[in-house]
């Protein structure tokens, strides 16, 4: 039990630090190990979601003035609808093939954006927002990792890193809240999840403080390449685990 508490605490520090520094990645970081210490995969995604939601809430309170709702609401509503549907079929999913496809996709996307990001200009049109929200909803519902599609949209559409961080965290806060309700309805919000949250919340606060300091010293261009690199590493991690 003591080892599990320590693991949850350290995982929460690392995941919160990544989220605060890059604007995403809490689920990607913590879900590499969390399923191995939780009773079920559904409970692991639920705990990851509420810890990530807490991280996002802290950031939204700090960055609220940078939110532009007209660029946020279409992708957010699409994400909520798709992710809830994905959660309802979670118990019937076969993860082996999906993990391989997810890993390959993340690697290809990260390489493409790293080399061609200067040529890519994402327009905030409804089709683009719906597409990003759909992909994000599928990844969030199945894997608890809704970040990459939404992040690639926001990092290209937002004028600076402050707007980027405000938009991503508001998106993740609302999305994780709705997914948590859906997971609770499906029986994934258990006593074990509640206890895990108590153990992890201190780590979330510490990781957020450290990440906030690092974020202030990052340039916008460097932040983009860190994001692309982390997406690629996440994809490689999926392939190796599979």
List where the protein language model places each region.
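Membrane helix-loop-helix hairpins that form the core translocation module of multi-pass transporters
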Residues: 43-115
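Selective transmembrane alpha-helices of multi-pass membrane proteins
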Residues: 79-87, 95-115, 199-212, 220-242
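Alpha-helical multi-pass membrane helix bundles of inner-membrane/thylakoid proteins
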Residues: 113-136
């Amino acid at each position: 039990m003591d080892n599990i508490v320590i693991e949850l605490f350290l995982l929460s520090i690392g995941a919160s630090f990544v989220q605060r520094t890059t604007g995403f990645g809490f689920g990607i970081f913590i879900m590499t190990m969390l399923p191995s210490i939780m009773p079920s995969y559904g409970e692991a995604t639920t705990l990851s979601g509420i810890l990530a939601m807490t991280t996002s809430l802290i950031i939204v309170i700090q960055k609220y003035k940078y939110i532009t709702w007209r660029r946020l609401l279409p992708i957010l509503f699409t994400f909520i609808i798709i992710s809830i549907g994905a959660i309802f079929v979670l118990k019937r999913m076969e993860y082996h093939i999906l993990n391989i496809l997810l890993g390959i996709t993340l690697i290809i996307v990260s390489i493409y954006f790293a080399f061609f990001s200067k040529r890519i200009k994402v327009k905030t049109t409804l089709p683009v927002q719906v597409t990003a929200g759909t992909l994000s909803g599928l990844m969030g519902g199945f894997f608890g990792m809704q970040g990459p599609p939404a992040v690639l949209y926001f990092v290209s559409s937002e004028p600076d890193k402050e707007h980027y961080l405000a938009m991503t965290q508001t998106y993740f806060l609302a999305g994780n809240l709705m997914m948590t309700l859906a997971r609770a309805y499906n029986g994934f919000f258990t006593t074990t999840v509640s206890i895990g949250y108590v153990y992890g919340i201190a780590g979330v606060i510490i990781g957020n403080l450290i990440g906030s300091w690092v974020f202030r010293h990052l340039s916008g261009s460097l932040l983009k390449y860190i994001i692309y690199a982390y997406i690629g590493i996440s994809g490689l991690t999926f392939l190796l685990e599979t």
